Amino acid sequence: MALVDENGKIINKEIVNYEDEKSEKFILEKINEYVARNSQGVNAIGIGVPGIIKNNKIIYTCNISLVDSYFIRKIRTKIPVYLANDALCATLAEYQLIDNCKYDNYALMTIGTGIGAGLIFNKQVYEGRSGYAGEVGHMVIRKNGLQCNCGRRGCFEKYASVSRLLQIAKVNTLKEFFNLVESNKYVASIFNYYLDDLAEGMANFIMVNDVDMLVIGGSLAWFGDKFYYILRAKIAEKLFNREAKDVKMKFAKLGNDAGLIGAAFLSEWLNQKNKED
């Protein structure tokens, strides 16, 4: 949680460990406590949620128990509250602060505990008719594959999330994993197969969305310099035309703060979108 000014500068930030407690009650309690301490002079509150959001309502979440159409009514404040997918929040921060809104069509794919994406088409936020746009983590890449928390089988994030990579390699952190890649042939082979699956999903995403710039975010982006060219080559192998193969692609710059900063921008972007609609 953070207090952010209109320029995207973080004034203060608090980190809450919710790994062992992901209930709505706990999350609301922490939000309300933070709002009570930091609401003076605040014009809007933005919240990023790892799930499907439509019209400021939580439609579905996969990895936390937070399905509540009236969630924002339980936040004790008179300040306007805006909800959006957490990947979309990160997208807005990178698009506005790093890329200065210069691309017409833009996407950021977050690769961490799960996989999600935020989309900007014609310089406008795109959530889709029902809020499902960007739910790339639940795109099936293996028919009858691994069971996903969403109820489907073979979902992209079951093969290409950071959680899956660490699980297969039997390590706790990406830092530990990449320390082993160069010296351990078994771990190197795991990473090669992992990049195949990551490239599969990313190639599908590129073909469907045809954006001007694709940014890779999430914890995997911190180590991007170790595999960027290998990943690009694997993606190119799965695409059939030159234009798709030449898509601009890079790693996010804002790290863990991207979602916080982007959430602070939600009121501006969503109000603009509503005016256009």
Describe each region flagged by the PLM:
Residues 10, 53, 58, 125-126:
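Hydrophobic "anchor" residues
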Residues 50-52, 112-114, 220:
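Short glycine-rich anion-binding loops that position phosphate/pyrophosphate groups of nucleotides
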Residues 2, 46-48, 215-217:
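Short, well-ordered beta-strand segments
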Residues 2-8, 14-15, 23-24, 80-82, ...:
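Glycine/GP-enriched mid-protein hinge/lid loop-to-helix segment characteristic of carbohydrate kinases
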